Amino acid sequence: MTVTLEDVSLITGLAIDGRPLCMSTDSDGWREQMIALISMAPTEAEADVEEGEEKKKRERKAAGAAFTWIQNNFATCPPDATDDVIQTHARVCMWYVVSRTLFPDSTGKNAPWMWLKALTVFDSKWSWGSATLAYLYRQLDDACCTITDSAGIGGNLLLLSIWSWERLPVGRPKSIRFDPWYADEHDELRRPTWAYKWDIVSEMTNDVNLMYQKYIAELDTITAEQVEWQPYGAGESLGYTKEFCLNPMCLRDKDLWLMRCPLICNWAVEFHLPHRVYRQFGLFQPHPPDWVDTDKALHRLDRRRQRKIKDWDKHHASYVTRFQLSVEQARSTARAPLCEHSQQAFDNYVRWFIGTTRVEILPPAYNEDILEEPVNFEDLAKGKYNRDVRKGQGVHAVPVINYVRTEIKKAADESQSILEKTPVGTGNDDGSL
């Protein structure tokens, strides 16, 4: 399972069609350029002081402004503002939202200059939807590879959270109510996105560490039958909810949801591979899915380690072209209808997936090599899991539950295989069984 362009469209309403968000991130003279765009920029002294505390000196100061600086200077647009002032406040507001929602880093303190630079022209036709998904993919990848105590995660966590709440019964809050929405019968573009279903939710007040352990246990025991595979509906009911009318932007690019294409956000190039999760679209899930080389070299590219590269539009020119061609092909070519979901095929896929991939977070209770017949109970007793149990240390029951479930499934499969190979009797009570 993964977040796809379908989720981006339904939850955020962001455009997928458009130019890939890939440009020069050169920050030389950024203060002068910022002043030209929004009439002011933080001074060096303001950049060094954040929320009243001296920041630690860094080798390279980030180009941009603290969110507190933006709030202090652009919180309210003057009632007698000219058109230019209104446009300036609108641009800064967009910069704030883009930096804080679509492309936040793990610190959550600053709005990078490059996102304001991307808003130099209001009607720039950027593919904001594909960019925010590329950035989220990269942030998830980086977070999985980070093991320090100070590790964090960035990206569009609103998108990730609602994707999870809609599909998985893990960590899902209760949706309490909807606040009244902006009422304008004649402007469909002011309607809410699917995220409005989670406008006001129950507050989680439990201990974070305890909830983390609880979520791990629930994720490790979840089964395919407990997943809501198509929460947005299907066919004619796709995107329909009785609670409110959906913004038409959420369905505008639905013909692009199945594109196999690179997703680009400046230095980050990730691949959108919906054929690996066709079950989420109600389609036939083959196994194994077609292999696609996602190029490990791309994952070594980021702004900090690759400071010499600034013109990302030139560096990633081939991927920009591939994205544009994918959009053209999806829009101009009559696609052959794909086969609908088959439960038997999906069961075969799940069996293959579990056999070739690590699907559990917690380590197994027992190693498979010591579970081969005959069972050596002395070896089992020496295992870490049983040692911890004897010492009275807190252990999860989940690994044992998964072990029992696996053994039951194995026994059922073996029994089925034996029955299939057993000769059928003649009907005169002379069968083999």
Where are the predicted features?
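Structural stabilizers in ordered domains
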Residues: 1-433
